């Protein structure tokens, strides 16, 4: 039996191995610290969550009523089956559905939340909703001209504004206040 051959490393190789081990060890410790912070110490509260639960309950109730009004307007006919005035009729339905949103947003905005965070971010949410409402009105006007294009909405930092609106609504448990999907079908 022959003894194992020992390989002598140069000082440069030893230093290189030591540095590599140090860098890998530091990365492992850093990742471990990040996950411990994320699961143990980081805030679990959403950045959109406001403290005034009475305000959110009131907003949810208003949005729920508006949603019921929109559901009563549903027209499941195909555009091709609706006749020569199909686009004009669809535009009128969109206007009525948008009116329910507009009325709900105006009613919600009549009373401000009582907490500081709510006072700061709810007006931004209302402004975003008003932008979406204007997008819907512009789309209805486009349909009246005979152009049957897909609905497109304003973008905010690369995302549709509806994503921002619906995220705020979901984070505050106001599911009826999410953007309706009636124009995205």
Write out the residue ranges for each language-model feature:
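Terminal targeting segments of Actinobacterial cell-envelope proteins
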Residues: 1-19
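Hydrophobic membrane-insertion alpha-helices, especially the h-region
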Residues: 21-39
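Ser/Thr/Pro/Gly-rich low-complexity linker/stalk segments immediately outside membranes or between
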Residues: 38-57
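Membrane-helix boundary connector in multi-pass membrane proteins
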Residues: 142-146
């Amino acid at each position: 039996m022959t003894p194992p051959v020992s390989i002598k490393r140069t000082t440069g190789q030893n230093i290189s191995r030591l540095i590599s081990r140090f860098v890998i060890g530091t990365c492992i410790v850093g990742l471990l610290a990040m996950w411990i912070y994320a699961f143990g110490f980081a805030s679990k509260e959403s950045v959109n969550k406001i403290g005034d639960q009475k305000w959110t309950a009131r907003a949810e109730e208003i949005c729920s009523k508006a949603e019921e009004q929109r559901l009563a307007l549903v027209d499941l006919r195909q555009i091709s089956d609706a006749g020569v005035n199909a686009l004009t009729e669809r535009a009128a339905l969109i206007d009525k559905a948008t009116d329910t949103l507009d009325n709900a947003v105006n009613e919600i905005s009549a009373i401000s939340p009582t907490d500081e965070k709510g006072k700061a971010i709810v007006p931004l949410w209302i402004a975003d909703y008003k932008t979406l409402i204007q997008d819907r009105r512009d789309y209805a006007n486009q349909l009246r001209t005979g152009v049957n294009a897909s609905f497109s909405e304003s973008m905010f930092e690369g995302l549709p504004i509806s994503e921002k609106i619906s995220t705020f609504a979901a984070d505050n448990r106001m599911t009826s206040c999410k953007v309706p999907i009636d124009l995205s079908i």
